[in-house]
From Swiss-Prot:
The complex is composed of six subunits: RsxA, RsxB, RsxC, RsxD, RsxE and RsxG. This is Ion-translocating oxidoreductase complex subunit E. One of its GO terms (biological process) is electron transport chain. NCBIfam families: PRK12405.1, rnfE. It comes from Escherichia coli (strain K12). It is a multi-pass membrane protein. InterPro entries: NqrDE/RnfAE, RnfE. It is an enzyme of class 7 (translocase). The keyword Transferase does not apply.
Length: 231
């Protein structure tokens, strides 16, 4: 159970692919102009990570070490092609919006990195969980960045959600404030870099605060009974 918890915590927070490893920044910065686009690409990446980790872990004993990387890339490309066709069939609007960034998941360092670092060494169930956790960590980062950019830039949230979830999702659109002239800085690539920088700073501050609280709690437990540590 502790290993499962560690895999989940590492993927979602401690070893977050976007905020700690800084991998896959090209799609992260390019696609996150809206929350819908960010969520769509994040979920697609999560599905690819989960399936490729599961497949590579299952086949790890039959994969020659000398040619393992080309085999990993072939497996990843096959899964990405299947996911691309699914999005094309069931979410064509999202497919058009994401464009080239769906097939580019094949070259995403996150996918190949987890295959080599984790799936090739661990069992199928734990590898699938690792892929899912890493993918959801990246999805959360994309979603937060996309939401911030959409709110600041257009004053809306979940605009175009019907492209991802179907016509019923039009009711999810929220207009936080009305604007006739969008704030282009937030919608263009410079806004993505600024937003990512703020998210990195925020995560650092949260980690430092948590580290300080753990240190204070450990110091209090180490004191003899009745002592408070105050002079």
């Amino acid at each position: 159970m502790s290993e499962i918890k560690d895999v989940i915590v590492q993927g979602l927070w401690k070893n977050n692919s976007a905020l700690v490893q800084l991998l896959g920044l090209c799609p992260l910065l390019a696609v996150t102009s809206t929350a819908t686009n960010a969520l769509g690409l994040g979920l697609a990446t999560t599905l690819v990570l989960t399936l490729t980790n599961l497949t590579i872990s299952t086949l790890r004993h039959w994969t020659p070490a000398e040619i393992r990387i080309p085999i990993y890339v072939m497996i990843i490309a096959s899964v990405v092609s299947a996911v691309q066709m699914l999005i094309n069939a069931y979410a064509f609007g999202l497919y058009q919006s994401l464009g080239i960034f769906i097939p580019l998941i094949v070259t995403n360092c996150i996918v190949v990195g987890r295959a080599e670092a984790f799936a090739a060494k661990k069992g199928p169930a734990l590898s699938a969980l690792d892929g899912f956790s890493i993918g959801m960590g990246a999805t959360c980062a994309m979603f937060v960045l996309g939401s911030l950019r959409e709110i600041i830039g257009n004053g809306t949230l979940f605009d175009g959600a019907d492209a991802l979830l179907g016509s019923w999702a039009k009711v999810l659109r929220v207009e936080i404030f009305h604007t006739d002239s969008p704030f282009l800085l937030a919608m263009l690539p410079p806004g993505a870099f600024i937003g990512l920088g703020l998210m990195l700073a925020g995560k650092y501050l949260i980690d430092e605060r948590m580290k300080k609280r753990r240190a204070e709690a450990a110091a209090e437990r180490a004191l003899p009974n009745g002592e408070t540590g105050n002079v």
